[in-house]
Design a protein with these regions (language model features):
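Short terminal or interdomain "cap/linker" segment that borders an active site or interface and mediates
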Residues: 2-9, 13-29, 131-164, 177-202
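N-terminal low-complexity or simple alpha-helical regulatory segments
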Residues: 2-105
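Amphipathic interaction/junction segments at domain boundaries or subunit interfaces
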Residues: 59-165, 182, 187
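Soluble, non-transmembrane catalytic domains of enzymes that act on hydrophobic metabolites at membranes
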Residues: 167-170
């Protein structure tokens, strides 16, 4: 496959060793709000450790947190054992919610004639920098309207909930630049620190 966006650190299609270290609180807040909207808030809180429960109930957006707190959030959400369609929808909601942040600048590109998901995928490093520190992303062209998105150094990839919700996140963002988009994790290419998703659109 042709490389569309090389890994930033290596400048090639060879992934680096660069673990994610921090997550923006905006992602966790948005994820909690999406669960609350669906009536899972109390169950979610009950699954958190006491320390995380105290921190998450008073969390504000825009703060940088250790990625371990992101893991705590996704593991608690995973323990809810929600249907995959619900988890995908939660990921889509998170993408929609954070569009009110500087990411909206990229979204405005969708109003320009000729802009496609490929243009948005070219911004993957910059978009990722808004909410994560560390790790790296590489994107390949699997077809005229199909991409393979790989994120390395991401410990949250060890949580099934994250794999599905992040696919929903990518689906929603790609859909802003297309009539309809789909995204799913490629499980055989995922590891405890790597998430690989296939994105397609029409």
């Amino acid at each position: 496959m042709e490389i569309h966006l090389p890994f930033r650190i290596t400048g090639t299609d060879k992934p680096p060793s660069a673990p994610v270290t921090q997550i923006r609180s905006t992602l966790i807040v948005s994820g909690i709000q999406a669960l609350r909207t669906r009536g899972f808030y109390d169950q979610y809180l009950a699954l958190l450790t006491p320390a995380a429960r105290t921190q998450f109930t008073s969390l504000i957006t825009g703060e940088w947190l250790p990625v371990e707190l992101g893991l705590e959030h996704y593991r608690a959400a995973d323990a809810l054992r929600l249907d995959a369609r619900v988890i995908d929808a939660v990921g889509g909601d998170v993408a929609t919610r954070i569009n009110s942040t500087p990411l909206s600048v990229a979204i405005k590109l969708s109003k320009r004639v000729g802009v496609t998901p490929w243009n948005a995928l070219s911004l993957a490093h910059r978009i990722n920098d808004l909410n994560w520190r560390g790790g790296d992303i590489g994107i390949w062209k699997a077809g005229a309207k199909e991409a393979l998105y790989q994120w390395v150094g991401q410990p949250c990839a060890s949580v099934p909930y994250f794999l599905t919700s992040f696919s929903g996140y990518l689906r929603e963002l790609s859909g802003l630049f297309a009539t309809k988009a789909h995204a799913r994790p490629v499980l055989e290419q995922c590891t405890p620190t790597t998430i690989t998703c296939r994105i397609s659109w029409i």
